[in-house]
């Protein structure tokens, strides 16, 4: 068994055959654009700021996405070597920018693990904590350190990637490497709105186990809805169609959009456990 999840065996014959018909992730990606009500999200964030609690757009999107995945667990499946696996955890990878003292901007990739006992506040706190620990020039996470070491030895990167790819293909890649890799994730998300850029449909990587890539774009007038006085945030989503059926994807997106329409549903632990204490929410002014 792979360290990141067991193989799914109780599949209909056609579903089990699809990964052999489309063996590569780039063969199997579909894309969709969802428009999120920017006015409603901003109003929700402002409401909690008045209560002294800090939230941001990416935390809102991730929380709604994860809550919908708990209702539709097949969205956390992945395909490797022609087989479908059920991931035994949920994590999100994303990129942040780090500005050096000479003005050059570098990127680093972070990964956050979520639990069913999380709510929108604990998810926001986890994201802020991992960003705070990695946003400065002198800070390096384990992924950065490993990459820096790998590229310090001529010829090593090509061999390491080749070895990791083949070990992963046969379920032999160690859990420690999977934890280091941003490409082994339930969802990869990028927030292009933060740099005032339009959304794109970003491919899912062939290396690793990413089945869904979400890209947040800068808000635009609601042309589709016909109300140009309101803004929506377009989200480009690319998904691996092999992990579930179109009907199951549709059910997921219905739930996802439902949580975004009523964000108050994300304020209590997703598994119904005891709500967190008020002091565990991220207060305004704390990054």
What is the role of each PLM region?
Residues 1-287:
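C-terminal catalytic/motor cores of large multi-domain enzyme assemblies
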């Amino acid at each position: 068994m792979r360290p990141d999840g067991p193989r799914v065996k109780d599949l209909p014959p056609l579903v089990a055959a699809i990964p052999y018909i489309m063996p590569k992730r780039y063969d199997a990606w579909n894309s969709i654009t969802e428009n999120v009500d920017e006015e409603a999200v901003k109003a929700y964030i402002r409401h909690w700021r008045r209560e002294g609690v800090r939230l941001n757009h990416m935390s809102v999107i991730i929380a709604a996405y994860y809550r919908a995945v708990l209702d539709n667990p097949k969205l956390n499946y992945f395909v490797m070597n022609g087989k479908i696996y059920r991931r035994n955890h949920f994590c999100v990878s994303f990129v942040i920018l780090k500005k050096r003292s000479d003005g050059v901007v570098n990127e680093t990739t972070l990964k956050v693990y979520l639990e069913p006992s999380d709510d929108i506040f604990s998810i926001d706190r986890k994201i802020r904590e991992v960003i705070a620990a990695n946003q400065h020039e002198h800070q390096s996470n384990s992924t950065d350190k490993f990459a820096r070491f790998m590229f310090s030895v001529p010829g090593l990167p090509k061999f390491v990637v080749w070895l990791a790819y083949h070990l992963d293909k046969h379920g032999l890649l160690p859990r420690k490497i999977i934890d280091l890799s941003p490409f082994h994730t339930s969802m990869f998300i990028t927030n292009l709105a933060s740099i005032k850029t339009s959304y794109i449909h970003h491919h899912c990587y062939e290396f690793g186990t990413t089945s869904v890539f979400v890209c947040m774009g800068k808000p635009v007038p609601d042309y589709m809805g016909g109300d140009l006085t309101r803004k929506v945030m377009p989200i480009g989503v690319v998904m691996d169609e092999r992990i579930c059926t179109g009907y199951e994807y549709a059910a997921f997106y219905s739930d996802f959009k439902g949580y975004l329409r009523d964000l108050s549903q994300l304020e209590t632990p997703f598994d119904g456990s005891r709500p967190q204490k008020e002091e565990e929410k991220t207060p305004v002014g704390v990054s």
